[in-house]
């Protein structure tokens, strides 16, 4: 960043432009008790070698999956990332999160986004996918806002166990509405109760939301939930783990109107929580209500294929009240990572990743269930994640496993729940699974 001077003359000019005579007058609305009335006391300037040493010592305090065996999940997963992903997305032509507005000089980036959209449509079994959303949580919230805008209804029913953070983001998005309400279905044995859900449905429901697999890792009865939604004229919104679709049926196959998801498992590292990728797909009839950006294929004046931004119904292009969303910059770089990941693996490769994650998770669950004092809480089918009841507080399990360089899983106490949420990916070897089970056995 270039150094820009701030001279006395510059400051006088700025104060004059704002109509005040002094800096104190400019900040008069800031209470005096919260103002800094002394020097910042910054550390002395350091040269490059000193700065590198300081930062390396700070980074050494981190605990990462490079050094620890990870069973963390809950929305962010430790999948293997081929080296080619970073090599491709780090190219200067791609290395930006911003949308290419000038189509005539951005055909490569636009085509890459178009390929991402096409791959996600195939994976989720949907007709149209946008260029990306911020993350899975905001994609879900935008899907609900879209449903309310489509049918004009106000009630939203969450059919099963949704990630608590996704629920929080959804409620935040709906706070500005005077009428919208979120109703949570009863969860029994890890999944939403279909019988209770029937009683929640009426002609005021705008959308029925389900996460598949759900927050506990269990598989919801999505076909029954979808039928109930459509019987009452509501839109059916599915938030699906994209890797799970290597072995599970695509949302479009069981009637989803809108499919969203957290795209982190598709080529993005866990990265201490972000940036991630929001997947957003719809059926064709809803395309004009689709939030975010959409890349389409067209013909130029010479009859050659070209790529453009199409259906740009965002607020900076039309009146705010008519806009489909207010998303600005997007996650194009993460979308590119997802496209590269899916292209490298192919259909069979993704199925193998999903299949290995599933089989290894079930092997570990069997090992843990055999340990005295430990049990698998739910009997419902699961993909690669499950809840374990422990003989000692889960927080203690997590702490003791750190001593063995193992991330034991997510302590559900952080979400006002109980138990340990354990996730397994294709990266976990049988030796690591056995080591973890044996270490848990020492705690029994």
UniProtKB/Swiss-Prot annotation:
SUPFAM superfamilies: PLP-dependent transferases. Coiled coil: none annotated. Its EC number is 1.4.4.2. InterPro entries: GcvPA (IPR023010), GDC-P_N (IPR049315), GDC_P (IPR020581), PyrdxlP-dep_Trfase (IPR015424), PyrdxlP-dep_Trfase_major (IPR015421), PyrdxlP-dep_Trfase_small (IPR015422). GO terms for biological process: glycine decarboxylation via glycine cleavage system; nucleoside metabolic process. GO terms for molecular function: glycine dehydrogenase (decarboxylating) activity. It comes from the Bacteria. Pfam families: GDC-P. It is an enzyme of class 1 (oxidoreductase). It catalyses: N(6)-[(R)-lipoyl]-L-lysyl-[glycine-cleavage complex H protein] + glycine + H(+) = N(6)-[(R)-S(8)-aminomethyldihydrolipoyl]-L-lysyl-[glycine-cleavage complex H protein] + CO2. Keywords: Oxidoreductase. Belongs to the GcvP family. N-terminal subunit subfamily. HAMAP family: GcvPA. NCBIfam families: PRK00451.1 (NF001696). The glycine cleavage system is composed of four proteins: P, T, L and H. In this organism, the P 'protein' is a heterodimer of two subunits. The glycine cleavage system catalyzes the degradation of glycine. The P protein binds the alpha-amino group of glycine through its pyridoxal phosphate cofactor; CO(2) is released and the remaining methylamine moiety is then transferred to the lipoamide cofactor of the H protein. This is Probable glycine dehydrogenase (decarboxylating) subunit 1. The gene is gcvPA.
């Amino acid at each position: 960043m270039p150094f820009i001077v701030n001279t006395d003359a510059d400051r006088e000019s700025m104060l004059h432009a704002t109509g005040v005579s002094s800096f104190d007058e400019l900040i008069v609305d800031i209470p005096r008790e919260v103002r800094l009335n002394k020097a910042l006391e910054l550390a002395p300037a350091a040269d490059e070698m000193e700065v590198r040493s300081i930062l390396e010592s700070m980074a050494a305090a981190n605990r990462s999956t490079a050094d620890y065996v990870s069973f963390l999940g809950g929305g962010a997963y430790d999948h293997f990332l081929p080296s080619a992903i970073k090599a491709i997305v780090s190219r200067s032509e791609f290395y930006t999160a911003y949308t290419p507005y000038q189509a005539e000089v951005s055909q490569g980036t636009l085509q890459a986004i178009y390929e991402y959209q096409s791959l996600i449509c195939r994976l989720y079994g949907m007709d149209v996918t946008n260029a990306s959303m911020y993350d899975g949580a905001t994609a879900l919230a935008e899907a609900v806002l879209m449903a309310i805008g489509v049918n004009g209804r106000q009630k939203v029913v969450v059919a099963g166990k949704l990630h608590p953070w996704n629920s929080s983001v959804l409620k935040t998005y709906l706070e500005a509405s005077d009428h919208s309400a979120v109703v949570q279905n009863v969860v029994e044995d890890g999944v939403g109760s279909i019988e209770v859900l029937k009683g929640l449905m009426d002609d005021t429901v705008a959308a029925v939301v389900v996460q598949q697999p759900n927050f506990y890792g269990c598989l919801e009865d999505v076909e029954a939930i979808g039928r109930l939604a459509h019987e009452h004229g509501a839109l059916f919104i599915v938030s699906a783990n994209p890797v799970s679709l290597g072995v599970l049926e695509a949302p479009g196959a069981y009637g989803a109107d809108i499919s969203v998801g957290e795209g982190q498992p598709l080529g993005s590292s866990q990265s201490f929580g972000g940036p991630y990728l929001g997947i957003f797909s719809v059926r064709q009839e809803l395309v004009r209500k689709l939030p975010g950006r959409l890349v389409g294929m067209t013909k130029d004046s010479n009859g050659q294929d070209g790529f453009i931004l199409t259906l740009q119904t965002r607020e900076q292009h039309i009146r705010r009240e008519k806009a489909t969303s207010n998303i600005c910059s997007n996650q194009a770089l993460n979308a590119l990572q997802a496209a590269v990941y899916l292209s490298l693996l192919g259909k069979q490769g993704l199925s193998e990743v999903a299949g290995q994650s599933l089989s290894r998770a079930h092997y570990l669950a069997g090992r843990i269930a055999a340990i005295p004092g430990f049990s698998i809480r739910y009997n419902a089918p699961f993909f690669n994640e499950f809840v374990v009841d422990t003989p000692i507080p889960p927080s203690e399990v997590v702490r003791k496993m750190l001593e063995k360089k193992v991330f034991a899983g997510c302590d559900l106490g952080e979400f006002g729940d109980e138990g340990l949420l354990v996730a397994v990916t294709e990266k976990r070897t049988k030796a690591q699974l056995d080591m973890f089970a044996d270490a848990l056995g020492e705690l029994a």
